Amino acid sequence: MSWFGRATSDAPVATISQVELDNKIVEATSESIPNGEIDLSIAFEITDLIRSKKISNKIAMRSLKKRLTLIYLNPNLLLSSLKLIDLCIKNCGFGFLIEISSKEFMDYLIDFIFKIHYNTKELTYGHGGGDVGNKIKIGEMILKYLQNWKIIFENQQQLQYVEKKYQELKNQGFEFPDNNNNSGENDDFNDQVTQLNSKFVVDSEVPPDWVDNEECMICYSPFSMLNRKHHCRACGGVFCQTHSSNNIPLVNLGIMEPVRVCDNCFAKYDKSKKHSRNTSSSGDYNHQSRSIQNDYGGTHGSRRQGNNNDDDNDEEEQIRKAIELSLKESGAGGSGSGGPNSIPSQSRPSAQPPIDREPESETGNADDDEDAEMKAAIAASLKEYETEKSRQSQYQQIQPVQSTQSTQPESDLYNISFPTFSSTSNYPQPQFTASQPPPQQQQQQQAQQQAPSQDLSQAEEEQINLFITLMNSIKNDSRKQKDIMYDTNLNELYGKVIKLRPKLNKSLRNSIEKYETFLEMNNKISTITRLYDQFLEQKLNMAYGNHHISTQFTGVPQQQQEGQFTGSQQQQQQQQPHLPAQGTGYPRYGGSDTNVAQQQQQPPISPNEFYNNLPQHTGFQNYPSYPQNQGTAPDNSYLSQQPSGASTRQKQQQPPIQTYPNQLQPSEPDFEDDDNEEPVNTPQIRVAHNRTSSGSCPLYPTNDIIPDPYSANTNKSTTPNSDDHNYVAVSLPHYPPPEDLSNELPPQQHYVRRASSSLPPNAYEDASLKYPTLENVEHDYDKKKNQEQQQSVNESDFPDVSKVSQFNNRGEEDEGRRNSGASGASSNKKFVVEPEPLIEL
C-alpha cells in the first residue's frame, strides 16, 4: 500500500466518470450524422481521454460494448460505432488493445452481432430489398476491420485472440475482402503500408503505468509523512516534491492540461522544445540570408532568375557567395584598421567587389573563379591571424623586462623610514599615465585571463558529493547493489565524475603549490618582522640606556621571578641553616625565654631579611596571591606566596610579624580523641608528636617560651624529641597560635581568606564567633589546669549531683574551653554530655 490508501500498482486516479464517456460516445456517433460517419473532434477527445488514462481501459471497452448493444439493429449507427472503435484502436495505446482483443469484446462482436444479425453467408443480394444490402455491407465492414486488426495485432502475444477469431471465421468459409485486388505493382506498397500501420498502432505512445517505490528515484530519499511521494505522468516513476515540482502539458500522450512531471522528463521535453525553436529560427535565418544575398547579388540574382531549372545549384551558389562576402568584409576591415582588435563594420560592405567580379563570374568557368576567390579569402584570414599572433608574442617579450624594473624598488621596503638609505633615488621608477596601467598589473590581468580556471565549479562539486552520497547508500543496501547496472542516472553521473578526475587532480596540485608558496612567503614575512623588531628594540635600548628607571613601582626582573619557586628555594635553605624546612605544621622556635614586650621592642626586620627567613615548604606556594589593604595585617602564609618582585613600598609598610603557615585546616576540632589523651604529668612531647603526625591538631608554643628570632643559633641542636616543655598539645581550631597580637593586629581583625576547596566561605568568621578569643587562651589554660588538679584530688568514683549542676552553670564556659583545646588530657576524665549548641538563625 502506498501512502493514504491506494494500491501500489494502480494507475492514475480516473478524472472522468463512465457516464460522461458514454455521453461523448453518443455525441461522436450521433444519428444526425449521415452515412455512418463520426464527429472527428469528439472522437479524438475520446481517444485522448482513454490514452491519458483519465478513465480505465476496461471501462472504455465496456462503454463501447454498451453502445454496440444499444444500436446494433441500426446499420448506420453500427457503422459509425465500428469506425469509432477502429479510431480508438489506432490511438489509445497498447493497454486499450489488450481490452479490445479480450474474449469479452471479440466474442460479443463476432458471435452475436456478426453471425446472428450480419452473417454474410446467409444474406444474399436481391432478397429483402435495401435493408439486406445494408446488412451485407455492415457484415463486410466487420470482416474488413477484423482482418485489419489481425494484421495490426500479429506477433503480439497478448493480442492473439483476434488472430484466433480470424482463423476460425476463415475456416468456417467466410470470405474476407481482398486488400490486394489491385495490380501486382501495388502489392509491395500495400504490405509496407500495413506494416507501417501496425508499427504505428502498436508503438503508439501512452502514459506509462505507475510504479511504486519507497524512495525517490532521483535522490533516493525515503518517503515519510512529511516527504510525500508523487508520480510523474510522463514516465510513471515516483519522486519526492523537490524532484517533481514541474507541470507541463503532455500533448503526445493526449494530456492537454499541465500535469506533474519529474525533473528528467521536464528536461527532456524542454530540450525538444528548444530544438524545435532552433530549427524554426534557423529556417527564418536562411530565408533572411537568401533575401540579403539577393540584394547583394545584383546581376547574379537576375541571372539566377533566368535559370529557374537549376534551383539546387542556385541555392549552393548563394551560400558560397554569402561566405565569400563575409570573408572579404573581414579581410578589408582588418587591413584597413591596422589593429588586431578592429571589428569590421556592417555598413562597410559596398557593391564594388561584386561589380568588379561580375565579368569574371559571367565569363569562363565560374566554379574555378569562385574556388580561387575562396582560397584567396582563406589565405587573407590566415595572414591576419599570423600578424596578430606575432604582435602578441612581441608584447609578451617586452613585459618581463618592465616587470623586473618595477619590482626592484619594492625589495628595500623596510629602509624607507630611515633617511640614510636613499633607496628611491637610486632606482628609476616607470612613469604611467592614467589610461595605461603598470605593465606588471597588465601581465597579471592577462595571465588571469589566459590561464584556464583549474578549480571545480559549484555544479561539479555538487555532482561529486551526490555521487558519493549515492554510492554510500548503495553500499549499505544489497537491493540497490543488484540494480546498479540498470540505474541510468547513476551511470550517467559516474561518467561525469570520471571526466572531472583530471581536473580535480590539477586543482589539487595547483592548491598544493599555492600552499607551499604561501607558506614560504609567510616564513619570510615572519623572519623579516622578527629581525625588524630586534633592530627596533636595540634602537630603543640605546636611546633609553642612559636613564635610570626607578624600581619603586616596578617589579624585579623576570629571571628573579622565575627563580622564586625553583632555584631560589635551595639557595635560601643554604644561606639560612638555622631555619629547618618543614612540610607540615608550624615552624620551630628556638632561643632564650623572652616575653612579648621584648619581642615588640626589637628593631623591625628589613624586607630582604624577612623574605629570606620565610619557610620554604609551606604547602601553599602554588596558591594565587591576593591584594592587600594598607590597614590590614597580612596572613603569613599569604606573605609566603607573594612573588619576590613585589614593590619595596609595600614591603616597608608591612609590620614585622611571625609566619604561621598551614592555616587552611578543617575549622571543626576533633572531640573524639578526648578520652584517649594522656595525663598532664606525662611528657607532652609524645602527645604532640602523635597528634602532629596524625594531622588532627598542631603544636602551639606557650606565651612564656616564645623564642627570640635573632637567637635561633643558640638552640640550633634542639629536636622535637628533646623539647619536652616547649610545646603543649591543644585541640584548638587551626588558626594562628596563642600570641599577644594586640599590638600587631587591629581590634576588629578580619582575616584574609583564600580560595580553598576544604573550607566554606565564612569559616573564619564562624570560628571567631563560636570560640573564645586568642588573648584568653593561655590564661584559661592555666586556670583550667589548676582546677583539674584540685578536682582530681577531691574527685570520687562517681560524680555528685552538685557537680552536674555546677557543670550546667559553667556549660557555656566549659564548652568554649573544650573547643579551644586548652584543657589538659587526663586519664581519669569521664565523658560528660555536652549541651547542644544553639543554632543561630
From Swiss-Prot:
Domain VHS: 30-177
SUPFAM superfamilies in alphabetical order: ENTH/VHS domain (SSF48464), FYVE/PHD zinc finger (SSF57903)
Domain (UIM): residue spans on this chain: 314-333, 369-388
Record-level Gene Ontology MF annotations: phosphatidylinositol-3-phosphate binding; ubiquitin binding; zinc ion binding
UniProt binding sites for Zn(2+) 2: 232, 235, 262, 265
CDD domains listed in its UniProt record: GAT_Vps27
Entry keyword set: Endosome, Membrane, Metal-binding, Repeat, Zinc, Zinc-finger
Coiled coil: none
SMART domains linked: FYVE, UIM, VHS
Broad class of where this protein is predominantly found: membrane
Region (Disordered), start-end ranges: 273-317, 329-371, 384-459, 558-841
Repeat recorded as keyword: yes
InterPro entries: ENTH_VHS (IPR008942), HGS/VPS27 (IPR017073), UIM_dom (IPR003903), VHS_dom (IPR002014), Vps27_GAT-like (IPR049425), Znf_FYVE (IPR000306), Znf_FYVE-rel (IPR017455), Znf_FYVE_PHD (IPR011011)
One of the GO biological process terms: protein transport to vacuole involved in ubiquitin-dependent protein catabolic process via the multivesicular body sorting pathway
Matching PROSITE patterns: UIM (PS50330), VHS (PS50179), ZF_FYVE (PS50178)
Ranges of biased composition (kind: Low complexity): 392-411, 428-457, 558-584, 819-830
Biased composition regions of type Acidic residues, renumbered to the chain: 361-371, 669-678
Binding residues for Zn(2+) 1: 216, 219, 240, 243
Amino acid composition bias (Polar residues), ranges on this chain: 278-296, 417-427, 592-665, 711-721
Composition bias type Basic and acidic residues, residue spans: 776-787
Location of the protein in the cell: Endosome membrane
Complexes and interactors: Component of the ESCRT-0 complex composed of HSE1 and VPS27.
Written domain comment of the UniProt record: The FYVE domain is involved in the binding to phosphatidylinositol 3-phosphate (PtdIns(3)P) which is required for the association to endosomal membranes. Both IUM domains are necessary for efficient binding to ubiquitin.
General function of this protein: Component of the ESCRT-0 complex which is the sorting receptor for ubiquitinated cargo proteins at the multivesicular body (MVB) and recruits ESCRT-I to the MVB outer membrane.
Family per similarity comment: Belongs to the VPS27 family.
Protein name: Vacuolar protein sorting-associated protein 27
Organism in which the protein naturally occurs: Candida albicans (strain SC5314 / ATCC MYA-2876)
Organism phylogeny: Eukaryota, Fungi, Dikarya, Ascomycota, Saccharomycotina
